[in-house]
Amino acid sequence: MGIKGLTKLLADNAPKSMKENKFESYFGRKIAIDASMSIYQFLIVVGRSGTEMLTNEAGEVTSHLQGMFSRTIRLLEAGIKPVYVFDGKPPDLKKQELAKRYSKRAEATEDLSEALETANKEDIEKFSKRTVKVTKQHNDDCKRLLRLMGVPVVEAPSEAEAQCAALCKAGKVYGVVSEDMDSLTFGAPKFLRHLMDPSSKKIPVMEFEVAKILEELNMTMDQFIDLCILSGCDYCDSIRGIGGLTALKLIRQHGSIENIPENLNKERYQIPDNWPYQEARRLFKEPLVITDEKELDIKWSSPDEEGLITFLVNENGFNRDRVTKAIEKIKVAKNKSSQGRLESFFKPTANPSVPIKRKETPVNNAKETNKKTKAGGGKKKK
């Protein structure tokens, strides 16, 4: 879920903290990517038609591999250096949110059965996507693929977004890529949305800067975290009836969550029983992340050509010629990206962002083409 309504809230109340950039402007940048979010999107859109998905001869889904392979090559060709961060064990406080997601998938499965009986194509498409879940096998497949491509993988001890934010704060990467806004709540200095969107969407990258958010909202980081918890996060229920704008007013008026309940109209607003907002706050401020330099030895290397052929072609039915051509693209791209950005050699100049007006762009509001990508493989699975 991320932080409910945060994009709109920032667009309306902290517009200078957001700017639109071209995809190509991130040449030479190292970026940390929330892997699970990307895999989820690939499973939803890549090669999908109704309930049909790309598979290998064993009937195993390969949409995530095709999406990860082609999208990562696009990043490399643009001179971008990706680091994929995978989720570890979720915090106990997230169990309630995960249970809700499980229930929603179960409901969608029932709705899908009804849609299949009535042959309603629109409902089949809609409910089929709602049943998607990223599994351990999907994650393991993508880790293996990325390592064979020479792209670094970080396995977070807990939340991937928290680890991404830690990498960014440590200066290991320029920014964090995800679609969930809680990367900002974890304190990621720079947060990027839409960088992983397909080129066919032609949506600019939206860059958020947490320092400017705090400046425009006139808040401390602690107050921003409280604002996000009040707005609605994955770790605890919010106060019923309070949305982002009301949460903003309350934090500005009272300073922290501690001072809010006693000043609320209890008839109008319902405070959850056993509300663990303090534990949620602690998870945002002190998440479980890797900080040891030895464990974060992030390096990009040459692709393992033989390994990629074995994994993609022999094991997963990808087209050999397309994979071979894709490998050549990776090699050319890595030579290109080694040139680096100019500021690596010269003193950087200021690049002030231009404030933008509020412009909400729904995630996944356009269907990705079902045509096979250049390194595609597999067949449809019903």
UniProtKB/Swiss-Prot annotation:
It is an enzyme of class 3 (hydrolase). Pfam families: XPG_I, XPG_N. Binds 2 magnesium ions per subunit. They probably participate in the reaction catalyzed by the enzyme. May bind an additional third magnesium ion after substrate binding. One of its GO terms (biological process) is DNA replication, removal of RNA primer. One of its GO terms (cellular component) is nucleolus. Residues 339-382 are annotated as: Disordered. Residues 123-254 are annotated as: I-domain. Its cofactor is Mg(2+). Phosphorylated. Phosphorylation upon DNA damage induces relocalization to the nuclear plasma. SMART domains: 53EXOc (SM00475), HhH2 (SM00279), XPGI (SM00484), XPGN (SM00485). Its EC number is 3.1.-.-. InterPro entries: 5-3_exonuclease (IPR002421), 5-3_exonuclease_C_sf (IPR036279), Flap_endonuc (IPR023426), HhH2 (IPR008918), PIN-like_dom_sf (IPR029060), XPG-I_dom (IPR006086), XPG/Rad2 (IPR006084), XPG_CS (IPR019974). It is found in: Nucleus, Nucleolus; Nucleus, Nucleoplasm; Mitochondrion. Residues 372-382 have a biased composition (Basic residues). One of its GO terms (molecular function) is 5'-flap endonuclease activity. CDD domains: H3TH_FEN1-Euk, PIN_FEN1. SUPFAM superfamilies: 5' to 3' exonuclease, C-terminal subdomain, PIN domain-like. Mg(2+) 2 binds at residues 180, 182, 234. Keywords: DNA damage, DNA repair, DNA replication, Endonuclease, Exonuclease, Hydrolase, Magnesium, Metal-binding, Mitochondrion, Nuclease, Nucleus, Phosphoprotein. Residues 1-105 are annotated as: N-domain. Structure-specific nuclease with 5'-flap endonuclease and 5'-3' exonuclease activities involved in DNA replication and repair. During DNA replication, cleaves the 5'-overhanging flap structure that is generated by displacement synthesis when DNA polymerase encounters the 5'-end of a downstream Okazaki fragment. It enters the flap from the 5'-end and then tracks to cleave the flap base, leaving a nick for ligation. Also involved in the long patch base excision repair (LP-BER) pathway, by cleaving within the apurinic/apyrimidinic (AP) site-terminated flap. HAMAP family: Fen. Interacts with PCNA. Three molecules of FEN1 bind to one PCNA trimer with each molecule binding to one PCNA monomer. PCNA stimulates the nuclease activity without altering cleavage specificity. This is Flap endonuclease 1. The gene is FEN1.
